[in-house]
Amino acid sequence: MMLFIPAYYLALGAYQAESEDQRSIFLIGDENQSDRVDVDARIVSLDPLQGEGKLRLVIQPQGNLRHGFSSSKTLKLLSPGAVKANGLGETVFERDRMLTPVDLIYSMDGQASDYPFDVHSAMIVLAINQTGPERSVPFVLWFKGNVPGFAIGLQPIEGLPSGIRAVNLTVTRSATVVNAALAGMVVMWAIGIGVLALIGLMLTGWYNIRMPALFAALLFGLFSLRNSLPGTPPIGTYSDFLAFLWVQGIVALALIVAVVATLKHRPL
C-alpha cells in the first residue's frame, strides 16, 4: 500500500502533464495590430496510416476588417499544399457574409510501420489576401492541437510577411501510447520466456496433457494482445519485429512439441 499510493499519484501527475501539453495554444504573429484577422486553427484528426492530418480553421476579422459577425472586405484564404475537405483550391469569404469554418487536409511524411516510435511531419502554409485591390492582410494564427494518443510539436517559420504564416508540424505517439506499447512487448516476452521454459521441461520428459490446449490458446491470444495496443497499425510494424513475431514463433514451436509429446504419451 505504501508503494501503491506514490505510484498512483505519479500516474495522475503524468496524465495531468500530458493533458496540459495537448491543450497548449501556440500563437504565431503579432496580436498588437488592430486591423488584422485572427485564425483559430485546430487539429481535428490525425491518420498516420493514410498519412493525413485534418485542420479546421475559424476566421475572425478584427478592427476595420470586422463587420458584425462577418468581414467588411472580401477575403481570400490561400493554403498551398492542402486539400479542402469539400474540394480543391482557395477559399473566398465574401464581404458581409457569415464566415464559416474551413476544413483542410494535409499530407504527412512518415512511416506508420515504425510504431510506436513513428514520426510524421508536415509543413502548413497559410496566407490571407484582400480582394479589390489584391493585397495581403496581416493575421494572427492561434494553433491548437489536442488529439488523444499523439504528441504534437510546432515550429514556426520566421521571417515571413505579415500576410503569410508557416509552421512545421511534427506528430509522434504520446508518452502514454509508447509506454503502453512497451508494456505490451514486455508481457509478450514474459510469455515467451515462460513458454521456452516449458519447452525445455517437455524435451526432458516432463508432460502435462493440458499443454496443447494452453499453447493453442496463447497462439491466438497473442493476436488479441497485439491488436489491443493503442493505435497499432496492421501487422508488420517495428514493435512486431521486436516482440510479437518472436513470441508467436516460440509459442508455435511449443505447440508442435506439445502435440508430439501428446502422441508419444497417448494410451495404447
PLM features: what roles do these ranges have?
Residues 128-180:
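Membrane-proximal, non-transmembrane alpha-helical segments
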Residues 175-268:
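Alpha-helical transmembrane segments forming the membrane-embedded cores
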Residues 88-102, 128-135, 157-167, 203-209, ...:
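Generic structural signal for short, solvent-exposed loop/turn connectors between secondary structure elements
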Residues 12-151:
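Soluble non-transmembrane domains of integral membrane proteins
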Residues 9-10, 208:
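Compositionally biased, intrinsically disordered low-complexity regions enriched in proline and serine
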Residues 1-9:
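Hydrophobic membrane-insertion alpha-helices, especially the h-region
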Residues 21, 123, 149, 153, ...:
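A generic structural micro-environment signature
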Residues 10-12, 191:
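Membrane-associated alpha-helix detector
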